[in-house]
From Swiss-Prot:
Keywords annotated in UniProt: Acyltransferase, Amino-acid biosynthesis, Arginine biosynthesis, Autocatalytic cleavage, Cytoplasm, Transferase
Pathway field: Amino-acid biosynthesis; L-arginine biosynthesis; L-ornithine and N-acetyl-L-glutamate from L-glutamate and N(2)-acetyl-L-ornithine (cyclic): step 1/1
EC numbers, comma separated: 2.3.1.35
Protein name: Glutamate N-acetyltransferase
Organism of this sequence: Methanococcus maripaludis (strain C6 / ATCC BAA-1332)
Gene (name only): argJ
Involved in the stabilization of negative charge on the oxyanion by the formation of the oxyanion hole, annotated site positions: T112, G113
Length: 408
């Protein structure tokens, strides 16, 4: 389906009726996102059995409440696996609720940072207060995005707009994430906060978010580690005057786009990463097989290091698909290295036969393509009609340095 929207500025404050801001002082930061009117909310969370206190708290709040007004998030501390962590999570929510003059059960929360250390509430509280004081600043969206960064190299934000019967609907988002990215969020450290002014029910929003997440955040891999804190929220406040039932396909497509763009920004910012990898597997027997194979490619450390060195070692791609669990016939599949625009494509394997070898034009073309900062790996399994695209990044020396020094 053709995209029926345009990209606009503003991130989470692009939709009508939303304010936001953030503040960070060296290691610790806090962000606030606020709807001026009642909103419905949906959330998806990490499936890690070791999960942070704000994850537990917000899961419960989402189940037991139908009206929401705000999201509060802190960086620098994960608030996970500590005595008193739930007390700290509730205190963070209470601080935001008091400042915004709304009930505590209308606030969702999230944290990111080091696991196993008690939250420095005296510092975090000050950061929340600073974020609240300047929620009308022109650069408030960027401030909120920067405030939740940890090892991120750049803030991640996107917004889109589409028109229905003369009225505009907007969806905006911010995210953080660079390491510990291999989410599996069902019902993604990675945080994503999305706002929209569509009129939609809680059930419809939850369903739409789950579908968007499965095609975006759950297809993103930096290092294969699933965080204890992965969370994505959507707030919808109905201020556009457009009902979801009048634009279901348009809204779902726009939400999926926002989610995918945020996911791609996250993997592009993988700790020390220089290159974005998009791995598309088509011709799979089932959707599950397509996902298994594409995720296996972007998760492979050998493939990641090959991309880092611009080495078109197609055997690593074939091996990753082979051990993924997807059905395949090694005598009949294709492997292609392409630029992101699909204008330049190098066949490495065709119908199970090696095309690229030392000195061949195909191998030389693949080497040149792999020097670019965005590359696409295409595998045709020739087993069926299903496909999936996963997102990953290269892996180099800087990743080891960052993670060997993280808690110090």
């Amino acid at each position: 389906m053709a995209e029926n929207f345009m990209v606009v500025d503003g991130g989470v404050v692009a939709p009508k009726g939303f304010k936001a801001n953030g503040h960070k002082d060296r290691k610790y930061g806090a962000a606030l996102i606020y709807s001026e009117t009642d909103a419905v909310a949906a959330g998806v969370f990490t499936t890690n059995k070791v999960f942070a206190h704000p994850v537990a708290l917000s899961k419960d709040v989402l189940v037991n409440n139908n009206v929401f007004r705000a999201i509060v998030a802190n960086s620098g501390n994960a608030n996970c696996f500590t005595k008193g962590g739930m007390e700290d999570a509730k205190a963070l929510v209470k601080k935001a609720a008091d400042l915004l003059k709304i009930p505590e059960n209308q606030v969702l929360s999230a944290s990111t940072g080091v696991i196993g250390r008690r939250m420095p509430m005296d510092i975090i509280t000050i950061e929340v207060e600073r974020a609240f004081k300047n929620m009308n600043l022109e650069n408030s969206n960027e401030n909120a995005s920067k405030a939740i960064m940890t090892t991120d190299a750049f803030p991640k934000t996107v917004a889109v707009e589409f028109e229905i019967n003369g009225k505009n609907v907007r969806i905006g988002g911010i995210a953080k994430g660079a390491g510990m990215i291999a989410p599996n969020m069902l019902h993604a450290t990675m945080l994503g906060f999305i706002t929209t002014d569509i009129e939609i029910s809680k059930e419809e929003l939850t369903d739409s978010l789950q579908k968007a997440t499965d095609e975006s955040f759950n297809n993103a891999v930096v290092d294969g580690d699933m965080s204890t804190n992965d969370t994505v929220y959507v707030l919808a406040n109905a201020q556009s005057g457009v009902k979801y039932t009048d634009c279901k396909a348009d809204f779902d497509g726009a939400l999926a786009y926002v989610s995918k763009e945020l996911a791609k920004m996250i993997v592009s910012d993988g700790e020390g990463a220089k290159k974005l990898i998009e791995a598309t597997v088509h011709g799979a027997e089932t959707k599950e097989d397509a996902k298994k194979a594409s995720m296996s490619i972007v998760r492979s450390l050998l493939l990641k290091t090959a991309v880092f060195g611009a080495d078109p070692n197609w055997g690593r791609i074939a091996a990753a698909v082979g051990y993924s669990g997807a059905e395949m016939d090694m005598a009949n599949f294709d492997i292609i290295i392409s630029d992101i625009s699909l204008e330049n494509q190098a066949f490495l394997v065709k119908a199970g036969e090696q095309i690229a070898d030392c000195g061949t034009p195909e191998l030389k073309l693949a080497e040149e393509i792999m020097k670019e900062d965005k590359i696409k790996i295409i595998v045709d399994l020739k087993m069926g009609s299903f496909e999936n695209t996963a997102f990953g990044c290269d892996l180099g020396y800087e990743y080891v340095r960052i993670n060997s020094e993280y808690t110090t």
